[in-house]
Amino acid sequence: SIRKLHPKPRIDSINNGADDDGSGSMAVLEIAEAIMAMPVKPKRSTLFIWHTGEEGGLVGSAYFVKNPTVPLDSVVTQLNIDMIGRGRAEDLPGGGDDYVGVVGSFFDSKDLGETVKAVNAKQAKPLTFDYKFDEPIAWANYNNIYGRSDHFNYARAGVPIAFFFTGLHGDYHQRSDEAEFIDYPHYQKITNYIKALTVEVGNGPRPQLNGTKPAKVKPIG
C-alpha cells in the first residue's frame, strides 16, 4: 500500500489536510451534486453546509445553530462527515477495507440509529461499522470524538445526528496528510453509502430523540 511509504521530506510547514477534512468536504459536494442530478428528489429539502472554524472550537457550527438559515426545528437530522479517506488496517488498529466509525446515532435517536444500520444492510457490500466512540465512557479522554466535530452543536440543540469518520491515523494534523495516501475506493464506498442514507432520511419519517442531549460534554474542536 502507498500509505506504508513515508512521504518525501518537505521544506514547507503547511498541513494540506487531505483527509482532515478535505475528504469530508469533497464528499459533501459529491453527495450534493448526485442528489441534484436525481430525476426524483427526496421529499424533504436537503441543506448542505460547510462549517468553518471547526479546529478553533466548532465555531462555524455554533454560529449556524444560533443563526440558522432555516427554522432549526425543521432540521430532522444532521449527518456529519469528517475524515473518511483512510481507515485501512495499516492506518489504525481494527481498520479494514470496509471500516467506518459511526458516532452518536443510537445515543441521540434509536430511530436514526436503526435507519443508519438498515441503509447499510441494503448496500451491495455493507460497510463494517465501529461504534466504539459512541459510548459515553469514551468521551472523557482525548478520543472524545463525539465532542470534536460539528455535529456536536446540533446534538446540543436537539437535532438527531450521525457522524461518520475513519479514525485518527498517524498523519492526522501532520504535513503528511496528503492526497496520495487517501484510500479512494474505500472513500467512494463510504460516500455512496452516506448519499443513500441522506436520501432515505429525506424520504422517511422524522427520527425521534431518545430524550438525551450531550449538554455536559465540552466541545474540543
Residue ranges: model-predicted function:
Residues S1-L58, I194:
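Alpha-helical metal-binding/catalytic segments enriched in His/Glu/Asp
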Residues A18-M26, V40, E55-V59, F106-D111, ...:
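Soluble non-cytosolic domains of exported or imported proteins
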Residues S25-E33, A62, E114, A118, ...:
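Solvent-exposed, polar/charged alpha-helical surfaces in well-ordered, non-transmembrane soluble domains
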Residues I31, M36-K41, G57-S61, V65, ...:
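C-terminal soluble interaction/assembly domains
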Residues E33-V40, K66-V70, K117-K125, A155-V159, ...:
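Sec-exported extracytoplasmic/periplasmic mature domains
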Residues K43-T52, T77-N80, G211-K213:
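Beta-strand segments within the central parallel beta-sheet cores of soluble alpha/beta enzyme folds
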Residues H51-F163:
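Metal-dependent peptidase/peptidase-like ectodomains
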Residues F165-G221:
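His/Asp/Glu-rich mid-to-C-terminal helical/loop segments that flank catalytic regions of hydrolases
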